[in-house]
Amino acid sequence: MISIVVFSLLSVLSVGMFTWKMRSIIAQIRLGKKTQRLDQPSLRFKTMLLVAFGQKKMFNRPISALLHFVFYVAFIITQIELIEVFIDGFSGSHRIFYHTDFQQVYVFIISTIEVLSLLTFVATLAFFSRRNIVKLPRFNMKELLGWPRKDANLILLFELLLIIFIFTMNGADEASKLLQSNVGYGFAMSQYLGPLFFGRINNPEILEVLSKIGWWGHLLMVFVFLNYLPYSKHLHILFAFPNTYFSNLDKKGKFSNMDAVTQEVKLMLDPTLVPAEMTSDTIASFGAKDVNDLSWKNLLDAYSCTECGRCTSVCPANITGKALSPRKIMMDTRDRLQEVGKNNLNCKDGKSLLGDYITEEELWACTSCNACVQECPVNIDPLSIIVDLRRFLVMEESKVPSELTGMLTNIENNGAPWQFSPADRLKWTEEN
């Protein structure tokens, strides 16, 4: 009875804390400006199935894709066992599904989970070595120093502990059943690991304690992971699906029109026009200076970022030694958004995304090639943020690199980037 009460309290507390934090994150995302992402629902659903559920873009790099796929499948299938854990926790039973007419199906499912857990254990060690021993370049860039690196390693540690607790529970149960009836459960891995690690224990009470340690350890790791998730880059586990559904379906390279500019043009063409949303107190702004100037999809992108670095690894500006890192753009956006969240969603703290987090040098290093957008496994669009920040620099602060000043002047005067009169534009065709 005590265990049921403790389990119930922990469950309510854990879910309550997680819900409270997620409400805060959603409130932060809703600070963004409106953007239309509800058109073409069938195509959006197809994109979500292929990119998020099917992991389509992950397989551009087969080795890491296979390792991640093991994690992904194990995470989904293991939830079946978690259902049993919760039923046992609320009812005070133990392996309730084993004692039913579906015993063989139950053994098959647990065996599948064990095989996947073992593969995940190997994949976890591989991921750890890639980050800390092999030290792949994209995992050792300056934006990952400090907390981001600790975050990645901490989640790998959680995964290892979770797997150890699962096999402790199953192995002790297997050894206990063999001791008492000479016939075990027959789980794929525990039928070997149980006797190997616990076979010398001849006291069923000790085996029961070990099983409970594994059960409670498994449960606590789930609760810890659940409430750690909103503070970690692994929030993409939840946000990858809506983020891919709300992907930009326009062709890459197509820039969005600015509503403020469109309104200004309409007013220039028809001075008598007064748009319904504009009042005499409304001051049009161009581009984005802070997170509240970006769209809600930009902010969802920031929280969906996995910090995998695929975007940065293909960025031509970064490859040639420039300051730009698309991954850092997304990380900075999320960091600023979290700071605004701590200020009760108030952006008026004397700071801004542009300047305090992202520098002008980073923005102007971007070639707008869309390589980062193409490479992202969850369809994040760093270029959209970069363009909006550059628009603010140009249209609000008149800050333009000298390399672009001549081009913009020519476009204004001649309607083309070149310093030729429009009347002379076709003279080259007359040359021999």
Language model regions located:
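Short acidic (Asp/Glu) and glycine-rich catalytic loops that position anionic groups and cofactors
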Residues: 26-29, 219-221, 308-313, 366-370, ...
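Acidic, Ser/Thr-rich low-complexity segments on the non-lumenal side of membrane proteins
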Residues: 50-65, 259-314, 319
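Peripheral terminal and linker regions in Fe-S/redox and tRNA-modifying enzymes
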Residues: 6, 22, 62-72, 76, ...
